[in-house]
Amino acid sequence: MDHRLLEIVACPVCNGRLYFNKEKLELICKADGLAYPVRDGIPVLLENEARKLGADEITQ
C-alpha cells in the first residue's frame, strides 16, 4: 500500500485515520473498530464491506 495514499484516505464513517494491516490486507479504523478490505491493491471503503474488529485487534 502506497504510504501517500494512506495520508489522504480516511474512514468513510468517521473521517478518521486508517492504518494498513499488511498481513490481513486491510485498512483499520481504530476509532470505529472497523477493517476495510484491500482487494487487488484497491481499498474497498464501503461500510457494508467492513469487518467489525474484536477488542484484541483494536489495541494492536
UniProtKB/Swiss-Prot annotation:
InterPro entries: Trm112-like. Pfam families: Trm112p (PF03966). One of its GO terms (cellular component) is cytosol. Disulfide bonds: none annotated. Gene3D superfamilies: 2.20.25.10. It comes from the Bacteria. Belongs to the UPF0434 family. This is UPF0434 protein ECA2555. It comes from Pectobacterium atrosepticum (strain SCRI 1043 / ATCC BAA-672).
